[in-house]
């Protein structure tokens, strides 16, 4: 009798301990803090994993919740289908084009995709180890993009025993409009990211994940967001390390200046025909507008200004609002904020080549001829007194343009100033402040079958923005007709990059002590980086005269006092 009771007790314990349950060969379910969700079994290269798609991680920010910090989910009673990706957030895509499949847009876009190694599904009393978790923040200039699989296929990583989470967050006017009020405080998109990380903490074990072993990562604006989160007091204890691909909190392609936020907000209200000055009335009119109208106004702003419109902002403390960015990122870095977070950061050899067609369509050359200050990186533009802007533009023109305004010259100045300089400078700053290791790379491998170049109609030399991402995430875009079988070297490079990333996710170093299959990658000393040229050519290099020249040139501007 006693043995039967013990057996029954053990069975009951096992059933309640199961965070996961395989219901049949075509679906799996997970028990979250808000209810049960049903996902789908999948496989890649003969290795099984499970995906839970379109999982809400907070109450949808519609109606009175527009612009506000996300609120907790209401629990649901029935099993929620998580078998399809949810709608993407409202946006105007000016870059990704055919890389992104046509998707429904909605304000109700707060969804995550969770991809889990098959071995992690049924966890009984810890017989399967908790897995490390990668939370990836998509790029898109804080204006467009999504966590969908078109650019972020999880196959390369989830089949190596890492849980991969991608997600949507509010973008452009919906995510980064700031009126400096409690109802429209700004940085809503960053708060969405913090909400997602808190949700992951609460539910990690339900997915077989280790809540104490979370890596955040991002590409472009997603990398900048990830770095900003490492500098925020609001994220303490939410993650362990960060990977920054082509973006930092110091990046020159955006500015956190409240001056810019005030300027862009004023432009928006003019386009919408809102002439009120009372913040409450402005909020009421913005809330009453259909989301489509706000999205159309944002599209007009993008056409007028370029890629970047609504951006993260240094915040003033507001009652009842979680502060994400409490000071200029460069000041926070100099003070040592975030220095104990291990970083893996990188840039490509010709970042801004990816934007070439967009710049041509934008008629950039004529716009520069009409207004030379356009060549000034946004961050510098709002650090410089207005009377000195033309002088600054001429200094940049002498350095990069040699008297000829051309797309080629802009691409060069953009690559150096927007991406390479911030990465080099962050490496220097980390060496000065001490703290956790930082690993820096330059990705210069020109793949034989670059899906990015094919889809976007590019034929440039060098490696542009986004191209390194395709060796870490599988591109599952609608442009399957343009996919070619990867070359032997392409496969080797995919294995190399995923190897570095997987090691960093597991041991905070690109090369772990218990994995000798990769060449040892030394931590940065403020003057060195790994130059990834091919799967067999990876060199540790000291900053050359070219890098030193880039640092000295842009340092000469940042030494000026920023505008208040």
Curated annotation (Swiss-Prot):
Annotated S-S bridges: 89-109
Protein name: Juvenile hormone esterase
Keyword Glycoprotein: yes
Lineage: Eukaryota, Metazoa, Ecdysozoa, Arthropoda, Hexapoda
InterPro entries the UniProt entry points to: AB_hydrolase_fold, CarbesteraseB, Carboxylesterase_B_AS
Catalyzed reactions: juvenile hormone I + H2O = juvenile hormone I carboxylate + methanol + H(+); juvenile hormone III + H2O = juvenile hormone III carboxylate + methanol + H(+)
Enzyme nomenclature, EC number: 3.1.1.59
Record carries keyword Disulfide bond: yes
Described function: JH esterase plays a crucial role in the decrease of JH activity in lepidopteran insects, by hydrolyzing the methyl ester of JH. It is also involved in the transport of JH.
Signal sequence segment: 1-19
One Pfam family it belongs to: COesterase
CDD domains recorded: Esterase_lipase (cd00312)
Keywords, sorted A to Z: Disulfide bond, Glycoprotein, Hydrolase, Serine esterase, Signal
Glycosylation positions in this chain: 81, 180, 402, 515
Similarity section: Belongs to the type-B carboxylesterase/lipase family.
Catalytic site positions: 220 (acyl-ester intermediate), 351 (charge relay system), 465 (charge relay system)
Organism: Heliothis virescens (Tobacco budworm moth)
GO molecular function, one term: juvenile-hormone esterase activity
């Amino acid at each position: 009798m006693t043995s039967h009771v013990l057996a029954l007790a053990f069975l009951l314990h096992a059933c309640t301990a199961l965070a996961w349950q395989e219901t049949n060969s075509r679906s799996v379910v997970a028990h979250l803090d808000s209810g049960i969700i049903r996902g789908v079994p999948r496989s890649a290269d003969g290795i099984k994993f499970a995906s839970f798609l379109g999982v809400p991680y907070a109450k949808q920010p519609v109606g009175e919740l527009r612009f506000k910090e996300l609120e907790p989910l209401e629990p649901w009673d029935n099993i929620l289908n998580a078998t399809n990706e949810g709608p993407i957030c409202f946006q105007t895509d000016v870059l990704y084009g055919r890389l992104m499949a046509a998707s429904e847009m909605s304000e109700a876009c707060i969804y995550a995709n969770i991809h889990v190694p098959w071995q992690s599904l049924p966890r009984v009393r810890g017989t399967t180890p908790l897995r490390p978790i990668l939370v990836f923040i998509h790029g898109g200039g804080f204006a467009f993009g999504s966590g969908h699989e078109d650019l972020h296929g999880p196959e390369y990583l989830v089949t190596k025993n890492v849980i991969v989470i991608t997600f949507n967050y509010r973008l452009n006017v919906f995510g980064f409009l700031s009126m400096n009020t409690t109802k429209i405080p700004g940085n809503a998109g960053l708060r969405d990211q913090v909400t997602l990380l808190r949700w992951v903490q609460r539910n990690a074990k339900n997915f077989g994940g280790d809540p104490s072993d979370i890596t955040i990562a991002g590409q472009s604006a997603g990398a900048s967001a990830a770095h900003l989160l490492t500098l925020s007091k609001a994220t303490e204890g939410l993650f362990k390390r960060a990977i920054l691909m082509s973006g930092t909190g110091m990046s020159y392609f955006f500015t956190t200046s409240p001056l810019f936020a005030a300027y862009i907000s004023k432009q928006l209200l003019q386009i919408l025909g809102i002439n009120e000055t009372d913040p409450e009335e402005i909020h009421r009119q913005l809330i009453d507008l259909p989301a489509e109208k706000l999205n159309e106004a944002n599209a007009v702003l993008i056409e007028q200004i370029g890629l970047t419109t609504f951006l993260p902002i240094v915040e003033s403390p507001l009652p009842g609002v979680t502060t994400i960015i409490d000071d200029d990122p460069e000041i926070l870095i100099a003070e040592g904020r975030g220095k104990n977070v291990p970083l893996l950061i990188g840039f490509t050899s010709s970042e801004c080549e990816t934007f070439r067609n967009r710049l041509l369509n934008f008629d950039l050359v004529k716009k520069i001829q009409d207004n030379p200050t356009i060549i000034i990186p946004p961050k510098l533009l709002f650090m410089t007194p207005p009377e000195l802007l033309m002088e600054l533009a001429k200094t940049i023109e002498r350095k990069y343009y040699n008297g000829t305004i051309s797309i080629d010259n802009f691409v060069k100045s953009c690559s150096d100033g927007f991406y390479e300089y911030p990465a080099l400078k962050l490496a220097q700053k980390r060496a000065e402040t001490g703290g956790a290791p930082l690993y820096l790379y330059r990705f210069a491998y020109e793949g034989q079958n670059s899906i990015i170049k094919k889809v976007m109609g590019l034929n440039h030399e060098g490696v542009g923005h986004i191209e390194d991402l395709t060796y870490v995430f599988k591109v599952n875009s609608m442009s399957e007709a343009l996919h070619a079988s990867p070359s032997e070297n392409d496969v080797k490079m995919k294995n190399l990059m995923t190897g570095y990333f997987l090691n960093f996710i597991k041991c905070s170093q690109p090369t772990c002590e218990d994995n000798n299959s990769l060449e040892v990658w030394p931590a940065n000393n403020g003057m060195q980086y790994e130059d990834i040229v091919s799967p067999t050519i990876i060199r540790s290099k000291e900053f050359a005269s070219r890098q030193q020249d880039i640092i000295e040139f842009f340092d000469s501007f940042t030494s000026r006092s920023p505008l208040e």
